[in-house]
Regions:
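Membrane-interface starts of transmembrane alpha-helices
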Residues: 30-38, 101-109, 131-138
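Hydrophobic core segments of transmembrane alpha-helices in multi-pass, intramembrane catalytic enzymes
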Residues: 8-13, 114, 158-167
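Transmembrane alpha-helical segments of multipass membrane enzymes and assembly factors
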Residues: 22-26, 120-136, 171-176
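Transmembrane signal-anchor helices characteristic of membrane glycosylation enzymes that use polyprenol
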Residues: 2-59, 111, 144-146, 150
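Loop-to-helix entry region of an early transmembrane alpha helix in multi-pass inner-membrane enzymes
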Residues: 2-4, 86, 100-119
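Membrane-embedded helix bundles of polyisoprenyl
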Residues: 135-173
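Transmembrane-helix motifs of polytopic, lipid-linked glycan transferases
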Residues: 15, 19, 108-129, 168
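Short hydrophobic/aromatic helix or loop-helix immediately within or flanking a transmembrane segment
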Residues: 60-69, 74-105
């Protein structure tokens, strides 16, 4: 595995910690220590399965990125490629410019949205309770849900992107935005 993949995964873990810090949940040393340990465990679980390739990845996602790579990246978006929504195809086209394996980039994108989903869930709960323990507990519950870990990190699927947007939509609707 490329060292850049490990670095990007570490940056995503740091981003998760930053979101908790920005939410005011790391003021107590015990909470900060727990957050660091849980982030290490959550991202360790994801790291352990990053190399796995599903048939879906081999038969579709990798071929779509390869098509973008051979056809000029973003210019290839003029053609019908795959059956995913257009914003996701923009990410695949972007990945075609990188020398990092598209398997890892696809999975890292999903992991990024695992964090957004956990944060959005925490934001929604924050509308009903200010308890730092409950909010942080929900953040890590979402990050440790088996379906969340497996969907992006193992299967290279993008469900966290859609679910994160849906939860953020509920937060914004609740706030009348």
């Amino acid at each position: 595995m490329d060292y850049r993949v490990i670095l990007l995964l570490i940056l995503e873990g740091a981003f998760a910690l930053w979101l908790l810090y920005r939410a005011g949940l790391m003021k107590k040393p015990a909470y900060a220590a727990a957050a660091v340990i849980l982030v290490i465990l959550a991202f360790g679980a994801r790291f352990a399965v990053l190399d796995y390739q599903t048939l879906d990845y081999q038969d579709f996602l990798s071929r779509w990125v390869d098509y973008f790579r051979r056809s000029g990246g973003f210019r290839a978006l003029r053609e019908q490629v795959g059956n995913y929504n257009i914003p996701y195809l923009y990410f695949l086209a972007l990945f075609s410019y990188s020398s990092i394996s598209d398997l890892y980039l696809i999975k890292l994108l999903s992991i990024f949205f695992d964090i957004i989903l956990a944060s959005a869930s925490m934001l929604l709960l924050g509308r009903y309770t200010q308890s730092p323990a409950r909010r942080m507990g929900l953040f890590f519950t979402v990050l440790f849900l088996p379906t969340v870990i497996l969907n992006g990190s193992l299967w290279a699927q993008c469900d966290s992107i859609a679910v994160a947007r849906a939860v953020l939509g509920v937060v914004l609707a609740r706030d009348d935005r």
